[in-house]
């Protein structure tokens, strides 16, 4: 959306790579805390972390100052999601709704599990392949309750408000009708995507059924309330950085110069990306249970 821009630091697909967000004044901001949850009435902001069809597991760095987007790392190795046949990378634009938080200290009444300590995830199903760090306005359509290694990990289904077909989508049943097979593929993808890494299949609440728009919005609002408690230090942040530039009631609000100092301490932008390992293109075949 207009008003937000990105600035890369270091080379893409490197351990040092970061994507910082800026506001309309060119000042650095946190995509987690400073971008409003709402873009308009009944329209939510979404921070795109992973463009559709790509494999690099990019995410908001919740524990880093200003929460830039970076590639997830495990045992000093950059993480890429596997291509689990018949899928290529992520099958939607994947990201998060800002100013939300799935509280690891809160036992969700629907799933019986605590939150995963991240902003709530979004799968954007429109036709455009978005850019990493792009901020879009989305219409929420429904939600899936995934249980990831014993933690609640909600997956919001939404569509870009700028999509030419957005007016035709108003609830989860419209996705079933207009994109047959997409929701079933979404469940299958989330169920099995960690199997190539040697992990078990993920589980779901509600027998892997998608809940409707109203249910989804209620869940988003509850995660927004948890975020408010987080950013105002009324709850334990579990190591999360709440440094921000706009939340007046937050004790961790900083001025633009302090935010700039965080970015200036990092390596400069790099025109060329690092080489992506060739095995990222490998296709994995796994028998469905």
Curated annotation (Swiss-Prot):
One of its GO terms (molecular function) is inorganic diphosphate phosphatase activity. This is Inorganic pyrophosphatase. It comes from Pongo abelii (Sumatran orangutan). Its EC number is 3.6.1.1. It is an enzyme of class 3 (hydrolase). It is found in: Cytoplasm. One of its GO terms (biological process) is phosphate-containing compound metabolic process. The keyword Acetylation applies. Belongs to the PPase family. PANTHER family: INORGANIC PYROPHOSPHATASE. The modification Phosphoserine is found at residue 250. InterPro entries: Pyrophosphatase, Pyrophosphatase_sf. Homodimer. CDD domains: pyrophosphatase. Pfam families: Pyrophosphatase. Its cofactor is Mg(2+). The modification N-acetylserine is found at residue 2. One of its GO terms (cellular component) is cytoplasm. Keywords: Acetylation, Cytoplasm, Hydrolase, Magnesium, Metal-binding, Phosphoprotein. The modification N6-acetyllysine is found at residues 57, 228.
């Amino acid at each position: 959306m207009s008003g937000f821009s990105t600035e890369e630091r270091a080379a893409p697909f490197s351990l040092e790579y970061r994507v910082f967000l800026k506001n309309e004044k060119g000042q650095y901001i946190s995509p987690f805390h400073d971008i409003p949850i709402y873009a308009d009435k009944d329209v939510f902001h979404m921070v795109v972390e992973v463009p559709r069809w790509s494999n690099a597991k990019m995410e908001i760095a919740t524990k880093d100052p200003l929460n830039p987007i970076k590639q997830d790392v495990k045992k000093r190795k950059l993480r890429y999601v596997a291509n689990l046949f018949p899928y290529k990378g992520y099958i939607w634009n994947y990201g998060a709704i800002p100013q939300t938080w799935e509280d690891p200290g809160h036992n969700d009444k629907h799933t019986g599990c605590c939150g995963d300590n991240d902003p709530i995830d979004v799968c954007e199903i429109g036709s455009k392949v978005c850019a990493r760090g792009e901020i879009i306005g989305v219409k929420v359509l429904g939600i899936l309750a995934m249980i990831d290694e014993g933690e609640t990990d909600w997956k919001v289904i939404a569509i870009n408000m700028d999509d030419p077909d957005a007016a035709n989508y108003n609830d989860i049943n419209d996705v079933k009708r207009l994109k047959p097979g997409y929701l079933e593929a979404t469940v299958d993808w989330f169920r099995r995507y960690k199997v190539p890494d040697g992990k078990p299949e993920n589980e779901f609440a509600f027998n892997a059924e998608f809940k409707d728009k109203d249910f989804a919005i209620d869940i988003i609002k509850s995660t927004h309330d948890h975020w408010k408690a987080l950013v105002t230090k009324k709850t334990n942040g579990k190591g999360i950085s709440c440094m921000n530039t706009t939340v007046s009631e937050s004790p961790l609000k900083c001025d633009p110069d302090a935010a700039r100092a965080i970015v200036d301490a990092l390596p400069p932008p790099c025109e060329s990306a690092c080489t992506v390992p060739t095995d990222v293109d490998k296709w994995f075949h796994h028998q469905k249970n």
